Structure formats: structure tokens, C-alpha cells
């Protein structure tokens, strides 16, 4: 347990400075360089002439990603006649047909129309569909088209499997002579995000049993010397392809890497999202007036995005500033702690962090710890799991011979929407220990982290948003120099805080404490150790044990014993009568 330096609040790229300085000398890199698994899937799919006939690619379904996938297909096209690799420009390039999201049976398969002339010699007219256009090539199909029109799939599956298309009349009520079935050699590529792929899997289990090959567009990359060069070449290719201004210097490249670490929520990874890069670089180009992009331009574009999306977060924080939502940032309270939450609003593009007051009260009872959120059906399953894990740790830590003679209730105060996740279980545990021991908690410190049954503190998501949410409350009321956040040590690699928070930490006006277990967290909040090997030391557990002892052997025990006897007598009287 120790206070973290401001230098750990953001990524450190000094070891890569030589590579950053030589950015301008790097060659643009193709997307396949950073997508080895997807490239291998496309290469093998192109080479196979029999099965599978379908390649599923998990990726955002938009034109930008489709264009890059088509680029990969063209790179690995094979000659179906001799099964040997063609050159980059094949003698006879295989067609690649893109089907839009609005695909009908007629558009996909074609149809047969009745003859215009009403005589027996007239032949019906045939309209070919996208499958015919993709003969001996590839059909790129959006997964949305299949899910929005499920009746397409059985016929499409049969056509791809058999290699034969059976014609159907455009009007089923009109009897016409259909042409003979046609042979088709088409490979289907389905593109869609992971959630839509899951829907398709549930409707067609064969897709996961070898009927289709699988590939995915990876969204991030582990940072090292080799991957950084490839990544910067990838960024350079995006800039060249979309005719954007180049970076002014290595500081601009570092600013991009910092923004990427924040986006990926990991100091050790680089994002590969095409849309994110294109949006950020386009807006940075706007800030630079079409000249070279500087670090200041990138930071300005990030601030502009934050400003556009700041209305809801600012309204939420304003409710705290005006006292409508009660959050303490100074003083001490028993059974109350500042937890940290991430709020996701439907229709809003980004999640934001805000503190939440978690309170716990105890009373005489049978040891039950009541989760109010769960009882009123505002708590999700993961939150309920976190509560039960926390209760198991408390029972183990107290090591009682009999049930705890107190019951407790824990609640997120002024929370009126669903709460889920286990990231508040450390805060809930601290509130419970405070209430049981009657030891107050320092309200200048907020807490986030999940706990396991052994008291170890585990990583949580949205760590940057959580820290910045509590900082906004503190800075509005005035920084005291003692405020800060307790977070899991395993979350340090996820930190990429904004410049204002980093400067406050650097000036010792705001603090970050990283903890590995409950024993490290509770002393920071209560100024007392959680437990000690020396039995004479006053600890949180010893205070709880004294309270339980007083209950069992003090005057309070006699009073409660008499009340229990009266309660039992009344119950027996009702049973007998």
C-alpha cells in the first residue's frame, strides 16, 4: 500500500523514442500486417475450393471495414482451376460483389418473370441476382441483411452447399416453365459485430461446427518495439489513403499514442479501430487548418469531442454541486463511503464517471446482510454475486463460532436505475466494517475495486472515468490536499488520466492509492488497521469482536434475551389457540 506517483498516471513511451523520432522514415503498412489471424483466415478461405464456402468475419459492418476486407481478399485470391496462387493482379480477377443491407430474395437469387406476350411460344424472362454476378468469386454480405430477412438463409445455405441455384418465379401465383437449375461457384463472406454474430449462431448452429470458417478484426495490439513500427506504418497508411496531413514531430505521434491508450483503457496496448483513427486524425486536421498535425492539434480535437458530449455528465455533476445528490468530500461518517460508478446512458456515445454514496446500517438480527438494490430488483446478477462474495469474506475474517448477532442493509443512496457489476464490492465491504465497528470513514477518499473471498482486490473497468468523476466534485468544492481515490493495484496499467488531474496529483493536491487487498484499503479510510497479529492492538476486527462480546455477555444481552422470551411466549400462545 502506497501513494502512486503522478508518473504512473499515463503511459511512458520514452523507451520507444528512437522509433518515434524516425516516424517520417517508416513505410506505410498494410492492414494485414496488424491482422495476422484475419489475414491467415482469408488466405486459407481463398485457397480452399471445396469446403467451407462461408467465411464469417467479426468486425464493424461499414464501408471502411468492408473495403479493407476486400483488399485482403484481392491479395490472396487463388486460381480455382489449378489451385495455385495468382499474382497480385490475376489474369482473370475473380469478382467480388458487395450486397447492401437491404437485400431481398429477388435481388440475391434473381427471379423468373412471365413472358410479356400471352402465347405458348413466348419464353419467360430471367433476371440474374447478386449470386450470379459473384459466380467464381465472392459475395460480401452484411449480417444485418440475414437477420432482418431470415427466410433468405435456408435457400442461400442450400445454394452454397450444393453449388446449384434452383430458379423461382417472381410471382408464385402464375404458373410458368422455369429454366433448369444453374451451377454456381460462390464463396460467401458475412460481416457483422460480435452481438449480431451471436444471434446468427443461435439461429444456425451449423456455423460454429465447421460449416463456416471464422476470422475477426482485432481491435487492439500489444505494444512492443516491433509492433510499434507496424502500428505507426498502419497509421501512416490511413493518413496517406485519406490524404490527411502528416504529423509535425514525435510529440504529435506521442499524443496519438496517449489518446490510443485512453481509448483502449490499457497503457500496454494500441487500438486498431479504423473509425477511431480516421475520426481523430480528421478532426486534428481541422484544428491544424490542413497543415501538419501537432500534439496540440490532437489534444484540441479530443477536448472538442469531450465538450460536444459533456451535457449529460455536467448535468449529473451539477446535481451533486447543488446538493440535490448528497456526496460528502470532507469529514468522517460511520457506515458511509464514496463509491465510484460508470454511467452508461442509452443514446449517449460515451460513459462517464460519478461518485455514489454507499451506506450501511446495522441492527440486532440473525447475521443477514441485506442487499437493498437486489431486493427491489435494481441490482443485476453480477452485483449480487459481488455482494455474496463480500459476505463470505466477512464471515471468514470474523471467524465466529455462531451467527453474527447483527443484521445489516447496504444500499446505493439516491440511485434510481439498475446497478450492476462487482466494482463496488470493496466500497460496500468498507461501509459494512465501519458500521459494525462504529469506526468512521474518511469522506475525502473514494473507493473502487472488486474483492474475492480471500480479501484480494481485483481490477475493475472504467477506471479513468471513475477517478475523474470524483476529482470534478472535489475540485469544484476546493481541493484540500487530502482527497483522492483508492483503486486496485492491477488497474495501474489502465490509467491514462487527463492533464488537469495529473497536474493536481503532481502538486500533491489529489492522490491515488493502489491496494492489493482489504488489509491495505481499510486503514486508509479509518486510520485503523483491519487486523493484527498482536492481540493487544486495536483493529477494526477487534472492535467488532468487542461489540459482539458486549451483545452476548453485557446488559444488552439480558435485555435482548427477555425480549426474545416474550416473543417466543406470544408465538406459542398463537400456535396453541
Predicted regions and their residues:
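Conserved ASCE/P-loop NTPase catalytic core
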Residues: 1-201, 206, 213-224, 228, ...
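Peripheral, non-AAA+ core regions of ATP-driven protein-machinery
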Residues: 1-27, 40-45, 70, 128-131, ...
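Short, surface-exposed charged micro-motifs
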Residues: 359
Amino acid at each position: 500500500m502506497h501513494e502512486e506517483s503522478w508518473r504512473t498516471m499515463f503511459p511512458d513511451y520514452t523507451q520507444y523514442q528512437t522509433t518515434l523520432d524516425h516516424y517520417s522514415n517508416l513505410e506505410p503498412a498494410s492492414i494485414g500486417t496488424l491482422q495476422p489471424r484475419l489475414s491467415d483466415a482469408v488466405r486459407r478461405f481463398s485457397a480452399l475450393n471445396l469446403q467451407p464456402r462461408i467465411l464469417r468475419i467479426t468486425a464493424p459492418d461499414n464501408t471502411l471495414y468492408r473495403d479493407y476486407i476486400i483488399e485482403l481478399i484481392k491479395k490472396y485470391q487463388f486460381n480455382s482451376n489449378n489451385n495455385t496462387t495468382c499474382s497480385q493482379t490475376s489474369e482473370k480477377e475473380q469478382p467480388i460483389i458487395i450486397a447492401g443491407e437491404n437485400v431481398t430474395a429477388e435481388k440475391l437469387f434473381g427471379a423468373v418473370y412471365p413472358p410479356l406476350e400471352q402465347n405458348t411460344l413466348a419464353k419467360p424472362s430471367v433476371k440474374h441476382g447478386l449470386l450470379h454476378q459473384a459466380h467464381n468469386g465472392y459475395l460480401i454480405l452484411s449480417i444485418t441483411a440475414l437477420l432482418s430477412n431470415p427466410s433468405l438463409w435456408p435457400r442461400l445455405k442450400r445454394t452454397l452447399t450444393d453449388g446449384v441455384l434452383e430458379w423461382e418465379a417472381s410471382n408464385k401465383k402464375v404458373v410458368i416453365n422455369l429454366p433448369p437449375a444453374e451451377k454456381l461457384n460462390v464463396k460467401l463472406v458475412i460481416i457483422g459485430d460480435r452481438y449480431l454474430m451471436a444471434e446468427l449462431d443461435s439461429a444456425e448452429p451449423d456455423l460454429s461446427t465447421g460449416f463456416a470458417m471464422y476470422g475477426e478484426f482485432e481491435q487492439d495490439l500489444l505494444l512492443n518495439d516491433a509492433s510499434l513500427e507496424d502500428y505507426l506504418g498502419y497509421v501512416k497508411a490511413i493518413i496517406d489513403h485519406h490524404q490527411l496531413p502528416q504529423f509535425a514531430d514525435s510529440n504529435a505521434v506521442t499524443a496519438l499514442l496517449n489518446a490510443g491508450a485512453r481509448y483502449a483503457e490499457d497503457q500496454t496496448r494500441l487500438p486498431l479501430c479504423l473509425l477511431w483513427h480516421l475520426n481523430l486524425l480528421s478532426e486534428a486536421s481541422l484544428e491544424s487548418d490542413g497543415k501538419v498535425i501537432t500534439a496540440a492539434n490532437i489534444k484540441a480535437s479530443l477536448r472538442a469531442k469531450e465538450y460536444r458530449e459533456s451535457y449529460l455528465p455536467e448535468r449529473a455533476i451539477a446535481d451533486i454541486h447543488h446538493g440535490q445528490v448528497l456526496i460528502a468530500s470532507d469529514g468522517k461518517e460511520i457506515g458511509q463511503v464514496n463509491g465510484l460508478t460508470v454511467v452508461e446512458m442509452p443514446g449517449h456515445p460515451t460513459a462517464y464517471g460519478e461518485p455514489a454514496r454507499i451506506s450501511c446500517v446495522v441492527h440486532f438480527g440473525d447475521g443477514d446482510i441485506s442487499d437493498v438494490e437486489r431486493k427491489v430488483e435494481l441490482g443485476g446478477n453480477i452485483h449480487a454475486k459481488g455482494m455474496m462474495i463480500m459476505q463470505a469474506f466477512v464471515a471468514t475474517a470474523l471467524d465466529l463460532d455462531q451467527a453474527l448477532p447483527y443484521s445489516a442493509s447496504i444500499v446505493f443512496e439516491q440511485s434510481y436505475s439498475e446497478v450492476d457489476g462487482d466494482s463496488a464490492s470493496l466500497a460496500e465491504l468498507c461501509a459494512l466494517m465501519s458500521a459494525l465497528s462504529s469506526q468512521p470513514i474518511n469522506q475525502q477518499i473514494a473507493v473502487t475495486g472488486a474483492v474475492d473471498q480471500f480479501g484480494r482486490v481485483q481490477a475493475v473497468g472504467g477506471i479513468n472515468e471513475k477517478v475523474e468523476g470524483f476529482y470534478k466534485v472535489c475540485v469544484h468544492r476546493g481541493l484540500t490536499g487530502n482527497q483522492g481515490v483508492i483503486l486496485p493495484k492491477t488497474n495501474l496499467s489502465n490509467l491514462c488520466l487527463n492533464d488537469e488531474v495529473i497536474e493536481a496529483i503532481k502538486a500533491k493536491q489529489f492522490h491515488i492509492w493502489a491496494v492489493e487487498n482489504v488489509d491495505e484499503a481499510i486503514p486508509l479510510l479509518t486510520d485503523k488497521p483491519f487486523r493484527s497479529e498482536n492481540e493487544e492492538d486495536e483493529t477494526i476486527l477487534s472492535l467488532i469482536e468487542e461489540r459482539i462480546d458486549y451483545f452476548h455477555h453485557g446488559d444488552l444481552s439480558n435485555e435482548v434475551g427477555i425480549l426474545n422470551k416474550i416473543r417466543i411466549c406470544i408465538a406459542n400462545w398463537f400456535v396453541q389457540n
